[in-house]
Amino acid sequence: MTVTQTNLDGILPLVARGKVRDIYQVDDNMLLFVATDRISAYDVIMENGIKDKGKILTQLSVFWFNLLSDVIPNHLVASSDKDIFAKLPEQLSEPKYKAQLAGRSLLVKKHKLVPLEAIVRGYITGSAWKEYKKSSTVHGLPVKSGLQESEAFEKPIFTPSTKAEQGQHDENISPEQAAQLVGEELCAEVAQKAIALYSKARDYALSRGIILADTKFEFGLNENNELVLVDEVLTPDSSRFWDAKKYELGRSQESFDKQFLRDWLTSHQLNGKEGVSMTEEIAAKTAAKYKEAYEALTGKTWA
């Protein structure tokens, strides 16, 4: 069953519907994060979904939250269906609701969000490569000359962006601009934690034959104003993963993500257009990439 939108008939209030997640309020302190099978490209959500995508994103996030818990606390309250349904209204255990929620939901603690996308880059690619070719900078930061496409930076760099409303574009900003936005002390802590998280994840991924080129973290503040890791973590939606065996300096790399979909949209001049449905072949190839990423990173077979 592919779930592109949840409908809980008002049993829990819907707080937000993002590009992928439907978020419900459980009580004053808790939210239910439901990762649907929606997929977007070029800031447009496709009409049809990718089978099991939401489940893979959810299980991969749980895997990383556990692996990285010694670096920073996270917002997880419950991640197993048994524990989640025990804390939800009984009605939601009925088959029509359970089918929408099982395997793709997380019960999380509510936090005050830090209004930054904490992007960490270990390799020069994508928009960073485009900027570097023009100005030898990345997010306005001077970077050493002579780098080739997909080359590793000497050290991972923190390149934040603003958190845009849905339908708007996140805007790349310099660390100095980020400090003006959230305060110097908080910005420095976000940068330090984001780089520590990236570094641990990069080393683990490399041990599994995967290069973590870059990723995006989001943070919140708890009641004691301490930093907490929130949202999703190190999924193909928030990260660029490359196969280490196929890595080749001086060119763009194939990612474990929705590149098939982007390429198909571009070749048919559909990028940025609303109301587009993927072909079965493109949906299946994209689903296979998400599954491949899960299996490569966790060492588990996706059932």
Swiss-Prot record:
NCBIfam families given in the database record: PRK13961.1, purC
EC number: 6.3.2.6
One Gene Ontology cellular component: cytoplasm
ATP-binding recorded as keyword: yes
PROSITE patterns per UniProt: SAICAR_SYNTHETASE_1 (PS01057), SAICAR_SYNTHETASE_2 (PS01058)
BP term (GO), one: 'de novo' IMP biosynthetic process
Name listed for the protein in its UniProt record: Phosphoribosylaminoimidazole-succinocarboxamide synthase
Keywords, alphabetical: ATP-binding, Ligase, Nucleotide-binding, Purine biosynthesis
Pathway involvement of the protein, from the record: Purine metabolism; IMP biosynthesis via de novo pathway; 5-amino-1-(5-phospho-D-ribosyl)imidazole-4-carboxamide from 5-amino-1-(5-phospho-D-ribosyl)imidazole-4-carboxylate: step 1/2
One Pfam family per UniProt: SAICAR_synt
Signal peptide region: none
